[in-house]
Amino acid sequence: MLTKFLTAALALGGSLVAASPILKDKRSFVERDGTNFTVFEHAATGAKLEFVTNSGICETTPGVNQYSGYLSVGTNMNMWFWFFEARNSPTTAPLATWFNGGPGCSSMIGLFQENGPCHFVNGASTPSLNPYSWNTYANMLYIDQPIGVGFSYGSDPVTSTVTAAPYVWKLLQAFFTQFPQYENHDFGIFTESYGGHYGPEFAAYFESQNSAISSGSATGTHVNLVALGVNNGWFDPTIQYQAYIDYSYNNSYNQLIDASDRQSYTQTMQQSCAPALTQCTSLTGSNSACANAQSVCYQDIEGPLSQAGNFDVYDVREPSNDPYPPSTYQTYLTSSAVTKKIGAKSTYTECSDSAGQGFSQTGDNSRSLLSTLGSVVSSGIQVLVWAGDADWICNYLGGFNVANAVKWSSQSAFQNTALKSYTVSGKAGGLFKTVKNFSWLQVYGAGHEVPYYQPEVALQAFKQTMGKQGLSST
């Protein structure tokens, strides 16, 4: 979910090192309070991986392995991960990572509320298997980042999307060394909300590291990146602040403002928000200018519009106290019996104010990732930008305009391609268009967390994108 903190993109100087240098890979097994851990120390990156095998929590499908634990990505920096093998053919299935947004929100949201192996239904206090889990098709890796989010704990030097990327890459490098059977598999990055920042930047960083490894200027495992998917993402503030106005006036569910209000807000956008954003035009914009832009645009556009009626910003069809998706999983993850089994060492925090404030101080939210997204599309990997049409906070009008604004060799063809009905087994699920390796999808009847509201549509879109295909109806 998007909690809208301000961030700045600062280059990460120097290499990432752990507290003590490791001369060669080491693997050991330890028992703590009745829980067995595998400990792996990665010589190349100095990372330390510590995890529990087959906890019996969440994924209970017979024969499907799971691993949960921590990667120490730096001094006192312990990043939480939870990995589930595919339910079908894990030795050949692709590998995908999932990141929730914030910035500063846990990927356990996605695991338990959206696309993970288990979910909570009908008010149950314990989870049941999710038949639409994305691990029916792919091996799935959920990561809590930056430090301080979810079960991750320790010191957090990350204050921007750009500074977050190397730590995620480092985790993946250690993961591949511990689980080398997956390193040659097709790999995808899937994310939502502030993932409109995370997704393009992480993909671009991984591709740049691949090039450095190929040229010999860096060492590591080549990541076979084939796909990027971002639903209800926050990519470009100039486009998407205007979309707050347009969507509030014209959506299929709940008109929030009238024509006069729309005109007034549009004038305010042109006179205050847009000029402030102009001062923060790229990742090289100053922290103060970008932070100021976020403050101005929130006060003049987002804040007032979010109070334009009694509605849930994540699902405009519902009142502000909307109880869905249910937060039952948070109570479940505070159970000492559960945390012991999965190897968690900290108290679960769904969204971390401190992690988000780091981004806030650098104005990261006000920086556009549109050009980075264009570079990723131009690289040739399969890219899906999609959105549930009942979400307000990162609404589909903004997402659609972002998709059309992406600069790449087939931009004109993409802009001029008509939308078509997207069906799942003949049932209408939305509107889409695909040109070469780039797709847009509007999902009917879905709020911010698309896989929760429309799991069948989400699973099909995921499979097609991860399978290096453009979207197509079935």
Q: Predicted regions: what is each one?
A:
Residues 2-474:
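Terminal and linker regions of secretory-pathway proteins
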